[in-house]
Amino acid sequence: MSSKAVAHPNIAVWIMALGIAFSMALVLTAVFNANPWEDHTYDLAPPIVAGMPAPHRDGREKMVCSSCHIVTPPAIGTGPGSGTLPIVQGTPAPHVDGREKMPCASCHTIVKKGSVAKGAKAAPLPAAVTPGMPLPEAVSVALAVAPAPAAVPLGNEAHERMVPFRYQGKVVSIAGAGARSVWGDIYIQINDGINPPIWIDLAPRWYLQAEGCVVRPGMFVKGTAFRDPTQAAAGLDYAMSVMANGEICALRDNHLNGLWANAGGMDAEER
């Protein structure tokens, strides 16, 4: 009887300690809910103009600027009125390459609705336009996206002629059969703001969904891929891995064999 009486308080203490530890874990998880594997603050870092010195002096100046910042091309001209179109006050920015986060007045003349900017030089009227005809104050131009290169059969010895490289950048466009069907391959066009945009063949859409690496336009992705040196950036590259949504997904092995071949896609429609 005495041994049982001594054991009960010890069990109660351990149960109470485990309950306190579990409660503290819940509180800390709710307070510090930042996932260290999530994508870094790529969308929060201010854009950097290509050719400008790095704004950091704590060691980050040795890193690639496009890892955290959107690199924009240098502006032509020295200020407002140097060939840029005016912007009507209150309208959304006409850019989608990172410049939409910059103050519009840095490059454009801000025009109030229904008025003409003071001191702005009137553009010459086209020959077919008569005086008195209202002219548009701002123009939104849609940028054309180059179509994705056609995929070619790789063969068993494709890895011997292709070279590996690292890629990173923002997803500009998505193409391939995976854009229409869960069973098709997904091609992404990425732009790092410095080099010409490239097309990369990732994997079937169901495999990306199963691995948690679904990509969308505007996302920052990076990884490793194989490229045919005879085609350079004009051809279709083949990804070995991709990091998206904070997840790192292996897509192909060193012989360019898709890892989804042994994964199976029986329940892909349910994911």
UniProtKB/Swiss-Prot annotation:
Heme 2 binds at C104, C107, H108. It comes from the Bacteria. Its cofactor is heme. The keyword Lipid metabolism does not apply. SUPFAM superfamilies: Multiheme cytochromes. It is found in: Magnetosome membrane. GO terms for cellular component: magnetosome membrane. Its main location: membrane. A motif (MCR 2) lies at residues 87-110. Heme 1 binds at C65, C68, H69. Belongs to the magnetosome MamX family. This is Magnetosome protein MamX. It comes from Paramagnetospirillum magneticum (strain ATCC 700264 / AMB-1) (Magnetospirillum magneticum). The gene is mamX.
